[in-house]
Amino acid sequence: SDLQEYLELPEGFNPRTLQLAAELQRDPRNARANHAQWVDVAMQRLRSGGYRYTLEPGVFGQHSADEFWFDKKAGFCEHIASSFVILMRALNVPARIVTGYQGGERNSVDDFWTVRQSDAHAWAEVWLEGQGWQRIDPTSAVAPGRTGTLQRLTPPRGAITNAILGTVNPALALNLRA
């Protein structure tokens, strides 16, 4: 299947996260869980498990998802998104990490966009049957103020949205400043 690569996990890494997935799958309450329900289970864990957003989580080792889910319970968007994706894949939900920028400021005087490194963000996409790839922002479960709701990942129609969707005027790139 074309989705197989989005289920792959490196052998020997994050054994506690794999064990968590196995325990969730054995739980009778999850006996008929579909992909969307597994997303809900993971997001609920993030919301209620004492996880927090920080730009200074310390150094993670080779089992970074295990450290996030069980030890540190803290990280920034890359830690949260990658740990979420590893759990999704362990639950047999095709998932991938997406990185980009969320935000930016339009200068109305000269019509330039300023996108800063602080606007960088990482989130996840999961494959839902009949819907295709769906954006999920696990950081929003940990730090709603950092990212807002999932809907904020779908900006209002405009230059940046058009750029993301591939319908942008090529001249837009000339008006972006990093």
Language-model features and meaning:
Residues A42, K73-Y101, A124:
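Cysteine-centered nucleophilic/redox motifs
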Residues E67-F76, D111-V115:
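Short, contiguous acidic/charged loop-to-helix segments that flank catalytic cores in large enzymes
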Residues Y6-P10, G50-R52, Q102-A178:
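Juxtamembrane membrane-insertion context
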